[in-house]
């Protein structure tokens, strides 16, 4: 079956804190399943903890490379978390719009993250010391321009207001978005703490992002899986390579890409 054989190739753009590694795919089992149904897949290869603007440059160059090597006119971007912000910047500020047919954002904090707002209240010296440790760590794993301090501050609700004013949607690009929510703090042991903080001030969330923050363009809905454990930020990219009752993440992406194909993208 070629139900995922879209007119334009797929560009998968990862979120913060990860790289596109050969032996550990950020997207878990998803790319293999998409390829099985005919998808032509590429990766953003941007840095783990660089700023939005820096990563956007990587994405812009990757789009140019794909178009040049394949002869295609455009790409379909599917971006998770911060990757959605990086992609929006590349499209609207760096001139990638003519080469992008669609942008699908998954659990992207378009309107910021309240957990980051609280984290930014840490003493300046302490925050910069923590940032220095992260920068050193990620520089050893391939980042040439890690900037934990700036990158994390770009997730604040205040920064998101400025970002959205400066990075307007590009005419001619189709924007759509998805969100998910955890049932409770036990749904994902990796995200129980930020989940509780955000739950107290903003309500339901995926452990990092609320549905309200994830909405951008045509909002396709919130995946809740209410009768079971809910779906966390990491679950949406098959981080743990686990199957959850009531939600098949690979099937979700197959349907997503199938719909893009049906729209002519």
Regions found by a protein language model. Name each.
Residues 1, 5-8, 101-102, 126, ...:
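Cys-dependent protein tyrosine phosphatase-like superfamily
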Residues 2-75:
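Active-site catalytic motif of lipid deacylating hydrolases and related acyltransferases
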Residues 4-5, 95-98, 167-170:
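Short, conserved loop/helix-junction motifs that constitute active-site signature segments
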Residues 13-16, 46, 106, 180, ...:
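Short loop/turn segments at strand-loop or loop-helix junctions that form parts
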Residues 165-265:
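C-terminal catalytic-base region of ester-bond hydrolases, centering on the histidine
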